[in-house]
Regions:
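Lipid interaction determinants
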Residues: 17-140
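Sec-dependent bacterial lipoprotein signal peptides
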Residues: 1-15
Length: 140
């Protein structure tokens, strides 16, 4: 009986050391950070002369630009970022790549995208699109 109790205690002690390696990104981790888009679906941007950015403020306020500027109050839940009431300007850009990205970005944010922050890289992903941003805070 004592051996069983000792084995049970050892098993419980060891199980306490196991953790879930997949940790969801929280709103607090994003807050007060600015990110610049580096790639779309694994392809680097063709023109990086105009930084395409996304910033996170208080209460998960999201703002940034693609072809158009966008902003809205978001929510991060279970590793998903949603900005249900996203405001976006509606201009036509000379750059076809930016025009192609504008609508999908709006849809990603409104419908929800998986968000992952790993060191200096932010990834927004849906079933058909992946956007990778790098940390580019204006102040260290």
């Amino acid at each position: 009986m004592n051996k069983f109790a000792a084995l049970l205690a050892a098993g419980m002690l060891l199980s306490g050391c196991v953790y879930n390696s997949k940790v969801s990104t929280s709103a607090e981790q994003l807050q007060h950070h600015r990110f610049v888009l580096t790639s779309v679906n694994g392809q680097p941007l063709k023109d990086d002369s105009k930084p395409l950015e996304m910033s996170f403020g208080e209460k998960t306020f999201v703002s940034g630009n693609m072809c158009n500027r966008f902003s809205g109050e978001g929510k991060v839940s279970d590793g998903e970022l949603k900005v249900k009431e996203l405001a976006m300007t509606r201009m036509l850009c000379a750059d076809p790549q930016l025009n192609e990205l504008d609508a999908p970005l709006g849809k990603m944010l409104r419908d929800g995208a998986q968000v992952d922050l790993t060191e200096n890289q932010l990834t927004l992903a849906t079933a058909d699109r992946t956007l990778v941003y790098k940390l580019a805070d204006l102040v260290n």
